[in-house]
Structure formats: C-alpha cells, structure tokens
C-alpha cells in the first residue's frame, strides 16, 4: 500500500518495550501542543552514556537521561500509548526519535536497531531509511543543540535538584538562546 510502513500494522511493541529519550525540543513540542507541564510526561532513568546520543543531565547530583514517562501499572508502556494498532496518543507531536525509529543515529550512519528490535515485521534498511533521512538530519541537529544546552546547564554551579526545575531551566535556556541568536 502506498504510504504504508512497517509501523502501519504494528500493535506498539516499541511503545511497550523502550524508554523514549527526549530532547528539549521534543519536550517543548509536546508541552505546547498538549497543554501539559513537562513533569506530567517526563521522568528520568540512570544515564545511558555511550548508548545514547543525547547527553545525560545532572539532576540531584546524578547523571540521568530524561525520557517519556512510562505507565505505572506494571505494563511499562509509554504514557502516551493508547493500545492497539497505531496506538500513539500524540502521533502528530511524538518525539523525533519515535519518528525515525527503528533507525538511530550513530557515528557513520543510521543503522536499523536490529539487536533488540521488537518489530513484528521486517524493514528494508535502504528503502525505509530514504524516507527518514530529513527527519534523521533534523534529529541530529536537535540533539546537537540540546546537548550544548545541557552541557552548559550541567556545568553551572547551581545544579537542578529535581526534574521539574531542571526542565524549567532547560526550556528557559532554549528560549533565551532563540531570542538572542534566532536559531532553531
């Protein structure tokens, strides 16, 4: 079918399997489009340093990655997953890493994440990657800018003591940077 992808018939296995790392850009998009505070949909996990391109944040003197909150009922699905086929409750505003999945940026390219891929269908790396190149490039740009902001925030002597204050500082830093330099 034209416009169909391997995700078109999936029951959300990736949404039920993974923690989704987010950038300040993802957080802002979700916040603005859903009218929610970031704490309503973000949480943290121990740092994935070396496995994730997104720089870890220092919160309460711990190195953590900011991720989408997962359900607390034990299923562990993304807080926005509604179940069933095409079950993403924020599909139009989902994090860019969800948009490009199962591809992920690594040095030297964008391989399909086959080692732990929960997909029920197979992907044609060459064909399916071609349709995601612009999104992957945008993701890399956003990760680079996010990492720069996080590095500055992590280095400041007044580090965040909790997730809410960290996200607030990060969003303020993004807004200030955009107003001063007009980028992003």
Region roles according to the model:
Residues 1-184:
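Short loop/turn segments that flank or connect secondary-structure elements
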